[in-house]
Structures are given as structure tokens and as C-alpha cells.
Amino acid sequence: MRHIRKHLAALLCAAAVALALLPAQVWAQSWENGFLTVSETQGNPLYPAQVTADDSNGTSLLAAGGMSSFDTAAQAADYIARQFKARENMAFFYTGYPADGPFLALTSGEESAAYSDEEQALVNGGTSRAAILQRRQLLKYVRHLVTEELLPEVFRYIPDDPTGGDYMRTQYRDVTYAADYDGYTFGVSVTFTYFTTAAQEAEADEAAEELLDFLQIDSKTDYAKLQAIYGWLCGHVAYDYAHQKDDTYLIKNSAYGALVDKAAVGQGYAALLYRLALASGVETRIVTGTGRGEAHHWNLVKLGSKWYYADASWDVGRQSWSYFLQPSLLYHVPDDASLAVIRTCPLSDAVFSTAPGRLNRDDSIDILDVQLLYTYLATGAVPQGDGVLPEGDFRLAADVNADGTVDVYDLQTLYETACGLR
């Protein structure tokens, strides 16, 4: 094993990986001493235009030594997720490949494709066509392994993980994956170009905790939590027009930029709202797509049994919010990946009512609402009937004084409101 790793080190130290605009792909391949080596860089599919050819900070770590070994995709994905959160690169041995080797069969088009410049150089140096095709098969397998098996699991949505799921999925610019295979050992490295460093994420962790304490989030209802977080974003984070068109300034896309630097573009606003809301116990997703025809990010948030849209970056500086807890957003077009998520989230068909106490759908606070709340307090069960809000929405609206508890004080307040005494 030590002998193999020394050969891996020699190979990978010699491989230079550059970036290229999608769909162009970067190949750094060599065939020496019986080793097959491939690598490729792909931009984050959310914003491929940000991938450039001359500013990658990623290099393969296959030469690092001391790598872990995994025999299932789930184990490898868990390792990648932990390394991602630490803003580290990663390399590992993988034994979960098919019995006949880490290769995928080529289509006729892939097999007959013209040689790339790098392949032609290898052919000119004496590399056989069979070896070139084997490289293509290995590259196809590692591409499939990383992008279709590992990363979807790495970015899987977990409601109680504020810095996982959608947060990680939107916080890197590109990924380079490389593989080495000698007929016995299959090594993989995955290198992300992150928007932030580990130190910046640690600073954001501390700042997020301090902000939530300042907002007294723990004492609020879910609606009041979102209202406080959204209000802080709209009032304290400036839209980063200075770097809006600068694709090399990655901080603008991050929660760190919004929280610590107090400046971000839409992606940074959405990432921070996601992070703060999940840390507060409110389910949230990040929606990706276009806003007025340009790449944009916004949020879905869950209140009661329904989901609502929110876009803090479009409400910055407004006295009244037009993009908070809406059933739809004008000029916002989700991409296919987000549409798949949205289909699993039952959307509200109306703007969230910011007037607690409306326990049915008649848009007024009257004696019927008082009767519904009295029944709920007496029986402990949400009343059933035409027009009565679903259970989750009912409990939210029933907390009339927004103290986090539904009790006789809410009933008294609701009665006085219905009678015109408030």
C-alpha cells in the first residue's frame, strides 16, 4: 500500500488542473508505471458562468497520504460532507466500484469522439487508442460517482442542519474530482472552490448565535421569528452593487458576507435566511432560478402546514415588504432542481395573514373566531369544519398575543378584539 501511495503521489504532483467555462471540461491525464489517472473540473450547475480559467485554488489531494477507505457511497458522502463543512479538500480510497473495475461503458458517440488536445498529445507520445478509451471510461465512472451518487447525498436537505443541505449546495463555485486506478486500488479526490474559508465560517457561526440571542428568537412564535430575521436582513444588509458583476469576489454570495460584512447579493441573503431560520427551528429551503431574467436565489419558508416564498434581497430598504410570505413572486422563475423541491412543499394559496386571531377563512375577527378558540382550549383539539384553518395554521393564528403559548389570555384578547374593545 505504501508503494502504491508513493506512485500516486508522483503522478498527482505532476498533474496540473485548470478551470474552464462549462460545458468545457478539464482533463489532466497521464499513463505511467501502470497507473491510470484522470481529473475533471465542473462548475456548480447553479451558476456555471462563474467558472473561469485562471483562478482555481484547487489541487488534487491524492498525494497527501493517510487516506481513509470507504466501501459504500453513503460512507464516502458522509466524509465529504464533514470535510465540506470544515472547508477542507478530500481524498479517499473507494472499494464500492463495480466488480469489473471503476469504469462505465462508453456510448458510440463517446467512443468515436475526436481526441482532445491533451489526448492527441498522449497519442503522439505513444499512448494506444485502447488506453485513451480506458481513460474515458474511468473518467465517466468517477464523474457519475461524484456528481450522481455522492453530491446528491452530501447536499441532502436536513431540517435541523443550518449549515448543511441547501446551504452547502449553494456555497461553492466549482468542484474538481480526480481518480487514480492501478488495477487494484482506486483513489478519489474531491476539491471544491469554496466561497468562504473555515475561519470565516467559524466567525459566521459566532455572529449568527449572537444575532439570534439579540433578536430573542427562542421566545417568539415561528411567524415572529421569521419577521425578526427578515426585518434584520432588510434593515442591516446592503445589496452589494459594488461587486455585483465581479465574479471573482465570492464573499458576496455567502451568508458570511451578509452577516459579517453586511453586504451581499441575493444568494447571500437567501443563504443567511436559510441558516438563521433553520437554527431557529423554522423549516426553510433555498430556491434557485432567475429573477427578472438574471441568476437569483430566494427562499421557501414553512409556517403551519403551508409554505411561502420570501426574498429579502428585493425588500431591502422598503418601509413595507412586498416579498415576505407570499404564495408566489412576480418575475421569479425557479429552475428545474428547485421546481422538484417545490412540488414536495404544499404552497399556500394566499399571503400569510399577519393578523393573528383569524381562525377561519372569512378574513375578519369576530365571535366565530372566539367560539373556535374557546372550543380548542376546552377540548385540546383543533375544531373541524368548513373554513377552519388546518391544525398547524390554527395553532399559529390562535397565539394572538404572540407569546409562544395558546391560553386564556389569547381568548380574552380575541374576545375584546371581536367586540371592538381593542
Residue ranges of model-derived segments:
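Hydrophobic/aromatic-rich core segments of domains that either
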Residues: 268-332
